Amino acid sequence: MSIVKKLIKDHKMIPHPEGGHYVEIFRNDDVTHIYFLLEAHENSHWHRITKTETLHFYSGSPLNVYTSKDGVEFQIDEIGSNNNFMYTVEKGTWFALKSTGAYSLIGCTVAPAFEFEDLELAPKAVSYTHLRAHETLG
């Protein structure tokens, strides 16, 4: 069994609406935390939430974090390399994620606690186009 299939099975991960797989591992009124897994052929579609989210790198290949506050100017950062193992996305910021290798396993902490009504997905055509167009900026 591949490491990706093992992670999904062992942690009982399910498909996430933005792409990849996840499992919620902690929740209270103040904060939520999930494990989030992206394989090489997946990306997290452009989305934004109404709360601040911190990404924590756990294993696999480094992860590109694409962000845009206004949908016009874009930034690419990487977590999981060069001693950079976390990244915070401010509330309302558009962002997308892409593994640089076979897979990336991260944690996502949202405060106050995440609810799915906090999530806004960009149209998939827009998501795909912008991610591919800006992939080489890093």
For each feature predicted by the language model, list its residue ranges.
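A short glycine-rich, His/Asp/Glu-containing loop-to-beta-strand
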Residues: 20-40
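Short acidic, Pro/Gly- and aromatic-enriched capping/linker segments at domain boundaries
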Residues: 2-14
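Conserved small/polar residues in nucleotide/adenosyl-binding loops
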Residues: 129-136
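Conserved metal-binding segment of the jelly-roll/cupin
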Residues: 82-100
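Short histidine-centered beta-strand/loop micro-motifs
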Residues: 25-26, 44-49, 66, 77, ...
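Portal/gating segments that form or line small-molecule/metal binding sites
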Residues: 65, 73-83
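Glycine- and acidic-residue-biased ligand/ion/polar-headgroup-sensing regions
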Residues: 40-41, 50-69
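A short hydrophobic beta-strand segment most commonly corresponding to one strand
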Residues: 102-118
